[in-house]
Amino acid sequence: MKKINIIKIVFIITVILISTISPIIKSDSKKDISNVKSDLLYAYTITPYDYKNCRVNFSTTHTLNIDTQKYRGKDYYISSEMSYEASQKFKRDDHVDVFGLFYILNSHTGEYIYGGITPAQNNKVNHKLLGNLFISGESQQNLNNKIILEKDIVTFQEIDFKIRKYLMDNYKIYDATSPYVSGRIEIGTKDGKHEQIDLFDSPNEGTRSDIFAKYKDNRIINMKNFSHFDIYLEK
């Protein structure tokens, strides 16, 4: 009889603990997405460095040092950190284009980015992208011609930033009152492949360095192979 009573007491305590802990877990979950949005809103509220036809001063196994004096005056440079595989595609005295998001602010002589480097391109082009938007699985208006790229070879960093900027301006995806809790961009190419970009990824401490480090791979795409992009947002 005593054994049965003990079992009942243990059961009651367990139920009470579960009912007490559950709201806490739910609350923490909401806090997490709130922090993620705050991190991303701060990180991507930024003016990118957009420089054309700059000379590579020197390269290391993981860094390109790029002369930007003609844009900034004085002895100024861009330091782009990237993977070994990406850095080996460039060498001293190459001319490159830069589109990058800084992760160190107020440096006196240099600007620090991850990736964001393509061979210099002098031809003037206007690639108006075809795009679709889905919210909670339902197709919305198409986003054709909303995103424009002015180079034949671009980094995923540039595509990512310009699409995010459009979503931040028009759908307020990172605002505190935004209903969106997850989302992704899918980049489709003409060979049927798709590359995904997580719109709600804020790793580690959520600093600009943490968030932008994914661009170290300096992934690029030739716009001749670009098909379209799809955006999926979830409430």
UniProtKB/Swiss-Prot annotation:
Gene3D superfamilies: 2.40.50.110, 3.10.20.120. The keyword Translocase does not apply. It comes from the Bacteria. Residues 1-27 form the signal peptide. Belongs to the staphylococcal/streptococcal toxin family. Keywords: Metal-binding, Signal, Toxin, Virulence, Zinc. Transmembrane segments: none annotated. This is Exotoxin type C. Superantigen that acts as a causative agent of the symptoms associated with scarlet fever. Has been associated with streptococcal toxic shock-like disease and may play a role in the early events of rheumatic fever. Superantigens cross-link major histocompatibility complex (MHC) class II and T-cell receptor (TCR) molecules, resulting in an overstimulation of T-cells associated with a massive release of pyrogenic and inflammatory cytokines. GO terms for molecular function: metal ion binding; toxin activity. InterPro entries: Enterotoxin, Staph/Strept_toxin_CS, Staph_tox_OB, SuperAg_toxin_C, Superantigen_bac, Toxin_b-grasp_Staph/Strep, Toxin_bac. GO terms for cellular component: extracellular region. It comes from Streptococcus pyogenes serotype M1. SUPFAM superfamilies: Bacterial enterotoxins, Superantigen toxins, C-terminal domain. Zn(2+) binds at residues 194, 228, 230.
